Amino acid sequence: MNKLQEEWNRFCASWMFNTRLPILPFYVYSESTLSRSSRYFPLIGWIVSAGTSYSTYFLSWILPIEISIILGMILSVLITGGFHEDGLADVCDAFGGGWSKEKILEIMKDSRIGTFGSIGLILSLGLKYLLLVNLFKISPWIFLFTSWFSHSASRWFALLLMMLIPYARENDLSKSKPMIKKLPPFDFALSTFFGCFPAVYFLYQFQNQIPNVLLGFFLSSIFVFYFRNYFNKWIEGFTGDCLGFIQQGTELLFYLGITVSWNSI
């Protein structure tokens, strides 16, 4: 297998893992490919953002902003299969109702949603809706660029958690386990490029917005390092659901950082 085909397979594996979109052509499965595909998680964020934010933007030509935002959020869930939202709900249920590592991990594996998960989803989706509406009213271009770097950087922060603490399920045989292990240095550097380039480009286009973006990164960093300690204390590591929780949380914090900064001007 040549190098180009190998990289394509890694990207396709990441595509399949993070979205419900059709399988890309010329993909050849192998576990070695799967194990290094997480380097492209932030790049998948570019694709999800492009599909949802530009659909919202074009819908706003014929529909009220609020309805366009709702439809864009629905499209995001359809593209990803609610993958990260499911992780957020499972973490809320598990840590809200569990009192030991074994019980927390058991609740996470339960496919049913409970009270804490429902509350977490309602609050996070409601906050996301309000923040996106506010960003769009500030400027459609601010909305588009913020969506781009928030989707990519939030997935990078999920990878950062993987680098900081071990996987919590020692004997897990799930198909996703090969994807959720520490990245080699080059892979993490590549994911950092895909995760941070949109923010750098945003600053290039809006050079007076450095404090806004830095606030988002600052809030997200505090969030990740707090939950690194929290997860390590209770389950001695992370699970795939923890990564979804981190992605959703940091995405919201980027939206919040830009919103706070703009409304303080």
UniProtKB/Swiss-Prot annotation:
Its EC number is 2.7.8.26. Pathway: Cofactor biosynthesis; adenosylcobalamin biosynthesis; adenosylcobalamin from cob(II)yrinate a,c-diamide: step 7/7. InterPro entries: CobS. One of its GO terms (cellular component) is plasma membrane. It is an enzyme of class 2 (transferase). Its cofactor is Mg(2+). It is a multi-pass membrane protein. It is found in: Cell inner membrane. It catalyses: alpha-ribazole + adenosylcob(III)inamide-GDP = adenosylcob(III)alamin + GMP + H(+); alpha-ribazole 5'-phosphate + adenosylcob(III)inamide-GDP = adenosylcob(III)alamin 5'-phosphate + GMP + H(+). The chain crosses the membrane at residues 59-79, 113-133, 141-161, 183-203, 206-226. Keywords: Cell inner membrane, Cell membrane, Cobalamin biosynthesis, Magnesium, Membrane, Transferase, Transmembrane, Transmembrane helix. One of its GO terms (molecular function) is adenosylcobinamide-GDP ribazoletransferase activity. GO terms for biological process: cobalamin biosynthetic process. Pfam families: CobS. Joins adenosylcobinamide-GDP and alpha-ribazole to generate adenosylcobalamin (Ado-cobalamin). Also synthesizes adenosylcobalamin 5'-phosphate from adenosylcobinamide-GDP and alpha-ribazole 5'-phosphate. Belongs to the CobS family. This is Adenosylcobinamide-GDP ribazoletransferase. It comes from Leptospira interrogans serogroup Icterohaemorrhagiae serovar Lai (strain 56601). The lineage of its organism: Bacteria, Pseudomonadati, Spirochaetota, Spirochaetia, Leptospirales. The gene is cobS.
